Amino acid sequence: MHRLVVLSSLLALTFALPQRIRNGNGRNGGGRAQQATAQQQAAQVPQGISTAQDGSTILDDTVMHLHSRESKPKLTPKSNLPIRFKISAPADQFLPASGVPGAAATSAKGTLGANILLHGDGGQSFFDMPNQNVQANTMGVALLAPNANLFWGGGSGLQRTDGVAHAQAVNDFVQNELPARVAVNTSNIVFTGVSGGSLLMSGFFIPAQMQNFANSAVELNCGALAPQVAFQNAATVMPQTRIHYQSTQSDLTELQASIPQAVAAYEQAAVDAGMSAAQINALQTVDNTPAGGHCEFDGQDFVSGVQTMLSSYASVMQGGNGTVQGIGAPSTGVVTKGVVGNEKLKFAAGGRKREAEVENMVNMKWARQAEVFETGDVQLLSCDRTSC
């Protein structure tokens, strides 16, 4: 049994979350002080209605995902998941029940598709919302991980211990809650993963939930895992699912191993589904040409790099010529190289982390911009910048 219950405000989310206790006066200070989790800090960033770069309206709200495998719901902490979301679409495409001024849709069935974005660890791309502009008749949607550290799939690194529950929550939101707020073409749902969000998409969502989204597409930016759960209806999913893997020359060391493993695994799934090499290359593509670090697709920065990929999403994922405007050298701009024959990606030196520097390497620019807390005080490891 799966259902979603609306939270009316941030108060319920903030009140329900535990406080993290840390020593005061620095890491080894003598006093005791409460250090809020990343999720609690995110709850302090106001929700509501704002305007997107292209003039669309952004609705920022939270729902509670209740998940039970039994006929009589018996909630556990892992099944009671707050899903904060952003929907960016023209105001008149929202349903009046959304509370958006100017909402004029009279039916949940619309003409706009939706690009569902899952951010990397720490939530940076949720707050940036690089998919906020309508592109190729597709609205933007971003979901915030229901995890204290804002890690999609929970856990850390390549071990996503809550991947099954989080993938289910994403599916249920798209199937049930999105059409309750905005008119959407449910036959045109595509997905984007960023770093840790890509790990959830490739490791759990595609094999477990993609059977519910016919003729879909998934862009896996700076991260990928081979399927971590049984692949449901792979013979149907693989011939109708577009997958693109985008990395950089100096991506994180662990991702330099896991991305090629994912490429090989999904290619094999396509072979097992009876697809030819030409058919596979038409749907599955990969590139790691840009010289840059983790998610620095423009060769400059994490935030601008992710924006670079999302600004050219339609070109890469929705029938375009595969050109990414502004991608970093030495790329020619075209990133859609078929996976067959390109499984063994060649990388430069990867981004390595030293244990003593883990906390200071975290990058959560949204928090600094909101003047909520300083990066150096965050007690988590961020896939958005230093690890996956």
Language-model features: locations:
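A domain-start/cap signature at the N-terminus of enzymes
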Residues: 2-5, 13-113, 278, 325-388
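Active-site glycine-rich loops that stabilize anionic/oxyanionic intermediates
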Residues: 112, 119-123
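Structural cue for short, hydrophobic secondary-structure segments
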Residues: 117-120, 142
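Cap/lid segment of the alpha/beta-hydrolase catalytic domain
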Residues: 134, 142-168
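Alpha/beta-hydrolase active-site loop
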Residues: 157-186
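Gly/Ala-rich beta-loop-alpha elbow adjacent to hydrolase catalytic centers
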Residues: 192-201
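Conserved hydrolase catalytic core segment
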Residues: 203-216
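The feature captures the conserved acid-bearing segment of alpha/beta-hydrolase catalytic domains
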Residues: 213-319
